[in-house]
């Protein structure tokens, strides 16, 4: 599917809010912007995801967060019941949409039967790393773009040792993200 077809698919999706749909309609005559947002998905690596906050396949938004979290949930579920009980700690920084993205991630994890410890207020990355170990969590998620400009947000993932994911887990999440994004904006795949 080319970027224009992907754009049209998103535009027609019932999963979009009215605001999201209006954002996409506003770029209808800007071919370069459509290409930038829909030429391919954000790439998931050992540090997670980072990108500008816009509606689109190649940007940080609630749909991309949900797909990445479903991939992460699959990795945790593959570790077994004990890993699911240990669960995940989730925190966020003060960037726009960080709380929304953290809650979306928490909902996907909970929907997969994985215990969630969601911080109620802003926390720095080192505190999440500590919390994962202190609470005996299987994993952690921090919604932050670190040093990147304010237009960005990110999704950092951690394993039970409080460090970034092992490469094999990151690769599994990346594979799953590609599966979910092949039917972009299909909300049924996100939870």
Give the predicted meaning of each segment.
Residues 1-2:
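Polybasic, low-complexity association/targeting segments
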Residues 8-105:
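An N-terminal, well-structured beta->alpha segment
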Residues 10-13, 83-160:
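Ferredoxin-reductase
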Residues 52-54, 100, 151-152, 166-168:
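Short helix/loop capping segments that flank catalytic or ligand/cofactor-binding pockets
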Residues 164-174:
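Short, acidic/small-residue loops that bind anionic groups at enzyme active sites
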Residues 180-185:
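Conserved small/polar residues in nucleotide/adenosyl-binding loops
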